Amino acid sequence: AAIRACEKIESQIDRDKLRELMSLMDEAAIQAMLSQIRDAGLLLEVGSCASERQILDAVNPGPERKRLFRRWLDALEAAGALAYDAENGLYCCRVGQTDIAKSWERIEFLGDNQSYGPALLDFMRICLSRLGDLIKGRFDVRSVMFPEGEFGAARAVYSDNIVASTANSIASAAIANIAEKFEKEHPGIPCRIVEVGAGIAGTTPSVIEATRGARLEYLFTDVSDFFLSKARETFKEYPWMSYGIFDINEDVVEQGYLPSSADIILCANVLHNARNISSVLSNLRKMLAPGGWLVFLEPIRRRNYSQLV
């Protein structure tokens, strides 16, 4: 079912243009990361070099942003914009100055052409324009993601773009297929779905639509009651939905959940928050009933633009 859903979506997009768009967004992110070092007066020309300490002192990332900035250095090296000389402990520049504005014009054109999601591109543009403040800790991206307690750009990131909607459709098709088989094998018994780390409910509506008519018990969980409160209002018309606090990094039973209490566990973009993935998977397995399914969505490639924040 998931493969069929994927094939249907693929037939509706221009794969070459979408690849170009993703590549340009990655390149724009690399340009923006490098510009923060150049704005600080380092690595201005091809062949110029600086140590990590010199770069950190010049850019001066905020205390909570140093880890992020080191990820930028790794991304710049992986993209070939910088080369690390291990013998001398220096990062050396391998690319010249580039025009981010010109790259962005093409990104906007392709984004519109492929219906990528204008709100997501707007979010990325805001992040790029505030990158200096962000890396110094003067700008919190959550102010854009959740303005005044609303979801804002969060929906653009997790649901309202072609990549997220495609992934959500594929996961939902798989869950619908599992629920259908469950009903045939267990007539009259509801299929128990537990969504872990459901957050803004980016995937939930797709699952509800795909399983329409199925007999379900749906437990919507997150670590924050903020998201649960929003979900209670959004899904109030579904009496078979319930809500609970759940942390993937804590023991299932100690949090008040019974072993073998789920037939399907859905983890949409949450497993990367695991402190120890083996422990988390073992923990989730406790909750799964025999023959149960774990359905998860996770990126398998780290995109440069996703590392901006």
Please state what every model-predicted region is.
Residues 1-194, 210-217, 295:
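N-terminal accessory segments
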Residues 190-194, 198-253:
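Class I SAM-dependent methyltransferase SAM/SAH-binding core
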Residues 252-265:
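A short acidic, Gly/Pro-enriched loop at the edge of an enzyme's catalytic core
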Residues 262-278:
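A short SAM/SAH-binding and catalytic strip from SAM-dependent methyltransferases
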Residues 264, 291-309:
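Conserved class I S-adenosyl-L-methionine
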Residues 278-293:
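A short glycine-rich, Lys/Arg-flanked "PGG" loop and its adjoining helix->strand segment in the class I
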